[in-house]
Amino acid sequence: KLMRGKKENGEFMKPFSPLKWGDAFTEGNSWHYTWSVFHDPQGLIDLMGGDKAFVSMLDSVFSVPPVFDDSYYGFVIHEIREMTVMNMGNYAHGNQPIQHMIYLYNYAKQPWKAQYWLRQVMNKMYTPTPDGYCGDEDNGQTSAWYVFTALGFYPVCPGSNEYVVGAPLFKK
């Protein structure tokens, strides 16, 4: 139940590989862009068959080995390299289109999974070392993700006034 690219005539692109980077997915793959329904997480949950199936798919992002198909680019782009080095399955935090994904556990009534993975990402991908900052900054998104997440909330849907609770680093 992953998103697929379509041709101009409305047909789905074939063959389909959820691990193929590029083509229909800019600097990412279907495992990353499937979650980009910022405006309607409940609709995506329903489309996937409910909370249990949705959470299973979210879990799969972290358990699918960090393998990839780079045939569209013809070489390993830095976003792919960053994903494989972080060794968190197909979760590619260094590329912004997936950064909101962990917060989607909240919509499926499993906030403890969001809290667990948020802390994993903060502890593993943001460290006070020369290589302790993952991926691109891209207009401040990567540092904004960290600041929001450290404060304990995040705007999953840009432009809305809704924030989703996470795992704050501060007790007060």
Regions found by a protein language model. Name each.
Residues K172:
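Catalytic-core signal marking the mid-to-C-terminal active-site face
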Residues L2-L169:
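Active-site core of glycosidic bond-cleaving carbohydrate-active enzymes
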